[in-house]
Amino acid sequence: MELWFTEKQTKHFGITARINRTLHTEQTEFQKLDMVETEEFGNMLILDGMVMTTEKDEFVYHEMVAHVPLFTHPNPENVLVVGGGDGGVIREVLKHPSVKKATLVEIDGKVIEYSKQYLPSIAGALDNERVEVKVGDGFLHIAESENEYDVIMVDSTEPVGPAVNLFTKGFYAGISKALKEDGIFVAQTDNPWFTPELITTVFKDVKEIFPITRLYTANIPTYPSGLWTFTIGSKKHDPLEVSEERFHEIETKYYTKELHNAAFALPKFVGDLIK
């Protein structure tokens, strides 16, 4: 008998993957966690029925969350990742030698635990000496921080359950306070096909707080619609005005210095969402 997993991305549309076996399933304090081995995409982390990451395509999301802001900032030393318990963004952050400390604040410790066990190629960097892992509420951590970070990355689930507070104007204002005077922040902001209103709302809220606010995209096969957006807010440095000499060689599979600028070239229907 064949076993298949289906994520209903809307009431009328979804994606399906053939499952070889279930590695772990658990109702944590915060969400339903499933780790499965798929035929096509390797091991897959699923939270509340939504695909969070897979071994095959994870690099796209993690590279684009990390490298766009880190190459935009001239000297990122202290970095905060809110969410991201799978460790993929942290792995990419550590590719930048200027980073002296990377802090991860993940609300669900079980995500960290089982990512280390079943997604070692993604989560392996969490044990690096430059990394501090905190199991706790990222919203509260931001509220308690001031003038501390060069770059803040919000690697959250969609705005449901424990992540709902991470999509509020108050949270973005807190991020601005937690950043240094030339700090940069980035957040994943879902897809333009199924959640256009979210993109419009987040962009508007961020733009009212950060003088430089831009939207960029990446193609991620297992995420709803495949076209994903990210909103970047910066106090001083424009991601479209990065000097050539700032780019240094790092090992990537998706991000390149050419793609850095190209990612900000939006399809018209996406650009219309933020006018």
Swiss-Prot record:
* Pfam families documented for this protein: Spermine_synt_N, Spermine_synth
Biological process according to GO: spermidine biosynthetic process
Q: Per the record, what are the reactions this protein catalyses?
A: S-adenosyl 3-(methylsulfanyl)propylamine + putrescine = S-methyl-5'-thioadenosine + spermidine + H(+)
Q: Which GO terms describe its molecular function?
A: spermidine synthase activity
Keyword GTP-binding in the entry? The reply is no
- Per the UniProt record, which EC number(s) apply here? 2.5.1.16
Q: Where does S-methyl-5'-thioadenosine bind?
A: 31, 106, 137-138, 162
Primary enzyme class: transferase
Which PROSITE patterns does the protein's record reference? PABS_1, PABS_2
Please list the residues that make up the active site: 155 (proton acceptor)
Could you say which residues bind spermidine here?
62, 86, 155-158
State the UniProt keywords alphabetically.
Answer: Cytoplasm, Polyamine biosynthesis, Spermidine biosynthesis, Transferase
> Which intervals of the chain form a coiled coil?
none
The entry assigns this protein to a family as follows: Belongs to the spermidine/spermine synthase family.
Primary role: Catalyzes the irreversible transfer of a propylamine group from the amino donor S-adenosylmethioninamine (decarboxy-AdoMet) to putrescine (1,4-diaminobutane) to yield spermidine.
UniProt-listed PANTHER family = SPERMIDINE SYNTHASE (PTHR11558:SF11), SPERMIDINE/SPERMINE SYNTHASE (PTHR11558)
Q: Which HAMAP family match?
A: Spermidine_synth
Q: Which NCBIfam families match?
A: MFS_SpdSyn (NF037959), PRK00811.1 (NF002010), speE (TIGR00417)
What is the protein named?
Polyamine aminopropyltransferase 1
| Organism placement in taxonomy | Bacteria, Bacillati, Bacillota, Bacilli, Bacillales
